[in-house]
């Protein structure tokens, strides 16, 4: 039983490390884009905006997996009511969606120059800056890594627990937090990371524009890659043990 427990724990940890490696791979692709594809500051900022959008969707998925008892309360029509998953996901979908829209508008106003003059609407924008530019490839890595994060996170979909029970393994969840604290830990980490990273990247883009060189962007990409990887590995090493043996004896059928 202990051997099965260790194998399951190693498997979960391996998936989490794989997610961290995929994020690192995403962060390194812009270096190739800057050198080989001649990406400019605007293209790089749009790429990282796309990363933020994907991580935001993954955050909504994390919230949808938090037990209702840990969601806390919300004020509806002046009354405090127990929050539901649908309420929380809906609230942060609107809040985060407005944030992403405002952020994109800000980037376009400051860094697009004349690039948007002949784009031809939203479809042309997506095709030019996310398909034809090659940005879709690193963003695919982010989507895969985000999916692994959701599946192996402390609050994961119910079918993961069902699959674990088939293997006679119970996945450990974090200790019950103060109602509302679980949501704060999931959402707060994303917003803090996004604000710090995006401010640094925007200043780097300004510097690259002023000096007329991609060197500041290259330095920022390398630093972002290192910081992201260290943060994710630290989170993995500090996570509670993933599997706990359920105590259910497997039944052999002849």
Stretches found by the model and what they are:
Residues 30, 44-55, 139-142, 214-226:
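Hydrophobic core segments of alpha-helical transmembrane domains in multi-pass membrane proteins
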Residues 234-254:
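Short, highly charged, low-complexity non-transmembrane loops/tails of multi-pass membrane proteins
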Residues 18-33, 44:
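The first (N-terminal) embedded transmembrane alpha-helix
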């Amino acid at each position: 039983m202990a051997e099965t427990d260790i194998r399951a724990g190693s498997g979960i940890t391996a998936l989490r490390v794989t997610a961290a490696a995929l994020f690192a791979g995403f962060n390194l692709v812009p270096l190739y884009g800057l050198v080989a594809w001649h990406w400019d500051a605007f293209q790089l900022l749009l790429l990282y905006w796309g990363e933020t959008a994907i991580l935001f969707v993954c955050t909504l998925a994390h919230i949808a997996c938090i037990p209702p008892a840990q969601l806390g309360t919300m004020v509806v029509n002046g009354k405090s009511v127990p929050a539901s998953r649908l309420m929380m996901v809906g609230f942060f979908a609107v809040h985060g969606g407005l944030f992403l829209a405002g952020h994109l508008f800000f980037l376009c106003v400051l860094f697009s120059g004349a690039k948007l003059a002949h784009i031809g609407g939203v479809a042309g924008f997506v095709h030019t800056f996310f398909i034809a530019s090659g940005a879709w490839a690193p963003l695919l890595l982010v989507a895969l890594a985000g999916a692994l994060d959701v599946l192996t996170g402390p609050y994961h979909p119910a079918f993961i627990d069902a699959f674990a029970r088939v293997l006679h393994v119970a996945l450990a969840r974090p200790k019950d937090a103060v109602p509302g604290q679980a949501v704060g830990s999931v959402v707060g980490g994303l917003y803090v990371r996004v604000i710090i990273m995006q401010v640094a990247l925007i200043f780097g883009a300004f510097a690259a524009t002023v000096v007329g060189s991609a060197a500041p962007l290259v330095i920022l990409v390398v630093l972002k890659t290192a910081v992201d990887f260290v943060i994710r590995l630290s989170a993995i090493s500090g996570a509670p043990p993933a599997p706990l043996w359920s105590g259910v004896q497997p039944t052999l059928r002849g």
